[in-house]
């Protein structure tokens, strides 16, 4: 029996692209996008965010604890994963839920 993996379209918001350039080189960014396209439920749902997810992604030599956090939203019915924010753990532990809810509202209206 063949094994079928569904891949999703990954959409990088302008904010994500700007922030990603501060956190990753092109190879690291491509590796993450490939991973999340194949594993759209990899992160944990952020409580109170309306369904946004946060995944921890390790950096070379620092692992997940010293790596980055990516906030994203699945629109799996549309076959889409929206990458919203990326930040280093050393920069911030969590994004306030009211900010995340506003981001999700804007994505739903897009």
Q: What are the language-model segments listed below?
A:
Residues 8-12:
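Short acidic alpha-helix initiation/capping motifs at coil-to-helix transition points
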Residues 27-35:
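Short, solvent-exposed recognition patches
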Residues 74-110:
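Enriched for short, Lys/Arg-rich terminal
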Residues 1-7:
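Short, intrinsically disordered or compositionally biased N-terminal tails of bacterial proteins
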Residues 60-62, 73-76:
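Short polar/acidic secondary-structure junctions
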Residues 66-70:
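Short, surface-exposed coil-to-beta transition loops
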Residues 34-64:
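A short, surface-exposed loop/turn module that caps and links secondary-structure elements
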């Amino acid at each position: 029996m063949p094994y079928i993996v569904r891949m999703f379209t990954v959409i990088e918001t302008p904010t994500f692209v700007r922030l990603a350039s501060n956190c990753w080189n092109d190879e690291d960014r491509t590796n993450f996008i490939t991973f999340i396209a194949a594993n759209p439920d990899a992160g944990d749902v952020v409580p109170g965010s309306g369904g946004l997810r946060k995944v921890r992604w390790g950096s070379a030599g620092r692992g997940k604890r010293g790596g980055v956090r990516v906030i994203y939203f699945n629109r799996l019915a549309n076959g889409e994963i929206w990458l919203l924010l990326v930040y280093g753990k050393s920069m911030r532990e969590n994004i306030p839920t009211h900010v995340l809810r506003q981001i999700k509202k804007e994505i739903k209206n897009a």
